[in-house]
Amino acid sequence: MIKVAIAFGILVSAAVLMKKKDMSYRQSILKSIYPMIMWSTNSNGKKQLLENKNGATPSMSFYDLTMNAIDASPFNFSNLKGKKILIVNTASDCGYTGQYEALEKLQQQYKDQLVVIGFPANDFKGQEKGDNQNIAAFCKKNYGVSFPLMEKSIVIKNNQQNLVHKWLSDPSQNGWCNQEPVWNFCKYLINEQGVLVNYFPMTIDPLDPLVIAAIEKK
């Protein structure tokens, strides 16, 4: 425990010294301690994995859904037919915000077969207070995000939940899954035919072998 505390102190100090102009001190510290957060929570995350083991198919097509991208332009999900899609609810001030870096690496590694899509949301402890313009700038400057981002919306179950997360968490639409996001950076994988196949909690890193195996599965 003493070694962990010392390491934590070093990381925090380094984060303060190396703070970027476009990052708050909180954001800089969270980015620095992200590896420690993942180390401490990863084992629990594997208990929360969900998989479409029975091959359930949706009664409502995912490709019929539309939303606005973060720049307010219409985004048509039908254009993604034939590729896997990883949907992630995101936030800029979360302990898991460091996953942006891994998500971008994942997108680049599998760009011919996968599209990562971020859904900024302020649903958990007010950790995404910025507007769409600020969120887009933060992601680009600090993590080099090139994958699509949707406009800021609500991802948890209520009457304002965005249509995509309504589909992801309603078994009457997707065929089997009723799991809403429990925190920022929960991940849903949709296959090339528009079938929801996996749910990964925030405690599973985007580059975890479990995620990679699901993406590479034929």
Regions found by a protein language model. Name each.
Residues 1-62:
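N-terminal targeting signals for export/organelle localization
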Residues 75-98, 103, 116-120:
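Short active-site neighborhood of thiol/selenol oxidoreductases, capturing the structured segment around
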Residues 81-85, 111-115, 143-148, 192-195:
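Loop/turn elements at helix/coil->beta-strand transitions in domains of secreted/extracellular proteins
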Residues 89, 113-130, 145-158:
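Thiol-based oxidoreductase modules, predominantly thioredoxin-like and allied folds used
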Residues 95-109, 130-133:
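Typically the conserved alpha-helix immediately C-terminal to a functionally engaged Cys/Sec
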Residues 133-183:
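Short, internal strand/loop/helix patches
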Residues 163-166, 170-218:
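Thiol-/selenol-based redox modules, centered on thioredoxin-like
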